[in-house]
């Protein structure tokens, strides 16, 4: 039921460095999206909490306050993730060659191959082999350095946060 979803939300923790990662990218003018095979009840909150521009995930069907066990179409699967990435890039007027995609599982492979730069973040071996770069530490802000973002820019974004 919805109460179980609330309990799950309160037990959710972000990857270390998530706030620094999103804050720095926003400060530098990046547009940020979540394209997840997870659930909108979580990604919508993460979007608001971290100031992310787009969030797409699977919607759980809830009838009379109870989960039905079904998903509402469209289902965010491997192929749909790539389609969403293309749609977001078009909406933001960003060429796919300038898009960075980060993933960890096989369901991310089509999306990763669509982007100009693809990064495995603690990814499965198949994802690491397909990626342009791989980050194998648990800190999401480590991705900033893969993107060539300077320490000074990270510190400036953090300094601007009260």
Where on the chain are the PLM-derived regions?
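C-terminal cap/substrate-recognition subdomain and adjoining C-terminal extension
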Residues: 2-162
């Amino acid at each position: 039921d919805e109460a179980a979803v609330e309990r799950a939300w309160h037990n959710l923790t972000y990857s270390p460095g998530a706030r620094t990662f999103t804050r720095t990218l926003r400060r530098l003018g990046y547009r940020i999206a979540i394209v997840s095979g997870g659930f909108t009840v979580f990604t919508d909150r993460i979007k608001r909490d971290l100031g992310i521009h787009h969030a797409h995930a699977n919607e759980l069907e809830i009838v009379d306050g109870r989960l039905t066990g079904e998903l509402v179409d469209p289902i965010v699967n491997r192929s749909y993730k790539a389609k969403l990435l293309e749609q977001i890039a078009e909406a933001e007027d960003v060429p796919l060659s300038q898009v960075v995609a980060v993933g960890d599982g096989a369901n991310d492979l089509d999306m990763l191959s669509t982007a100009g730069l693809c990064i495995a973040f603690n990814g499965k071996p198949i994802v690491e082999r397909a990626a342009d770069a791989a980050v194998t530490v648990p800190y999401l802000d480590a991705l900033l350095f893969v993107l060539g973002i300077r320490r000074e820019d990270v510190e400036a974004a953090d300094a601007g946060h009260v």
